[in-house]
Amino acid sequence: MQYRSNLKRAQAGFTLIELMIVVAIIGILAAIAIPQYQTYVAKSQVARVIGETGAQKTAVEDCVLNGKLTASATDCAGTATGSSLMDGTGANTVNGTKPVDAKMGAPVLAFVGTDGTATLTAKFGNSAAGVLTGKTIIWARDKEGTWTCKSDVLKKYEQIACPTSSAT
C-alpha cells in the first residue's frame, strides 16, 4: 500500500511540471502570434479604407462629366455610407447633407481646379488600429482622368494598390 501512495505523489508532481511546460509553450506562441495578428488586422483595415474611398471615384467621374466642379463638391460627395475606420472630425457628411454618426467618417472630396483634378482623402480614426490613427489614404485624379493612390501608412501596412508616399 505504501508503494501506491508514493506513486500517486510522484505522478502528481509530474503533472504539475507538465502543466507548467504547457503554459510556457502557450505564452511563447502568444508572444509570437499576437503581434502578427495585429499587423494582419492593420493591413486589412488599410485595404478596406482604400476600397471604401476608391468606390467614390465613380461619383467624381460623373460630376466631372456633368461639369459639376464646385469648390464645396456637395453635389459630388458620392454615395459613401461612412466607415468606422475613418476619422469623423472633418467633413462628417455624406452627399454633402446627411450627417454621419459621430463614430463614423467619410472620405473628403476636393476639386483642385476646374480641369477635373480632384482628391478623395480618407483619414484613419475612430476604431482603426492605433498604428493607423491619423494616417491618410489619398486618391488623386489628374486632368486626363487617371487616378493614383498614395498613403502615409508604414511600409509594412501598405497595399499594392496604394503604395506609401514616404520611405517609412
Protein language model regions, located:
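N-terminal leader/signal peptides at the extreme start of proteins
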Residues: 1-17
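Short, intrinsically disordered N-terminal pre-domain segments
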Residues: 2-5, 61, 165-168
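Conserved helix-loop functional segments at active or binding sites
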Residues: 3, 28, 52
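Short, conserved catalytic or interaction motifs in soluble domains
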Residues: 12, 31-34, 39, 46, ...
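Alpha-helical hydrophobic helix detector
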Residues: 20-36
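Membrane-proximal N-terminal amphipathic helix
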Residues: 42-72, 78
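Periplasmic/extracellular, small/polar-rich flexible segments of pilin-like filament-forming proteins
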Residues: 65-168
